[in-house]
Amino acid sequence: MRLLEHLWVLAADLVRAAIARRPHQVFVPAPLASTRRDLHAGLVQPDRTTCGSACLVVARMLGDRDYARWLETGEVAGRTRDPRPRRRRFADEVLATHVRTNRWYGASGARQVAWPRALGTAPWALAHELTVTGGTSAPGTRHHVLVISPRRRGEAYDDVVGAVGRGHAVPLYVGNRTLPRHVVLVVGGDDAALTAYDPASGGPVTITRDAFDRGALRVAGWSEPWFAVVPVGRTAD
């Protein structure tokens, strides 16, 4: 085992132990979640740094039919039709989301840790954005970053399945043995496999439980699961 991976395992286990000492938190149902067949193909991230932002936009589309209709058709009640092509409208929304998640203040106006856009979207910024905008949850539903220890991937898989089983879409950070490098959005799953939206292709990918456990995902060229962003059973103040 590489030294960096050994240190990562140790750090992840310490974080998980700290989380385990907190009061038990239960996933809440997703009252706004639509059916997963509403996930339309062809929603591709506009550049190589916006996979997380694309997942945020698609999660909100799944939870907000008016927002999804506007992105798909440019039409929304009470407003002039947006003339941009669907691909351009989606790309612009993703890029605007990326700016919002990476600046010094978030969607709520509260200060946050800025993050270089060239490095993508930090997990904590993605969690904050979902807490404020809701995604497939009601706005104000707290989200937190689940650290996926290489020694406890099975537990993390069960947590993700539990969340999607309640109607939530779950962002999943994947990468190599050294770093997280990409984000996909898990939109369905069971004990055997997960179904995820991959913004690199704009289409669905299947992640088997065995591949998740072994760190052999083969998702957009990446193998290791690193973080999942999941809702918890309370609302933000």
Regions found by a protein language model. Give the residues of each.
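Active-site nucleophile-adjacent alpha helix/oxyanion-hole segment immediately C-terminal to the catalytic cysteine
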Residues: R2-S108
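Conserved active-site-adjacent core of cysteine acyl-enzyme catalytic domains
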Residues: L4-E5, L14-A17, R22-Q25, R84-P231, ...
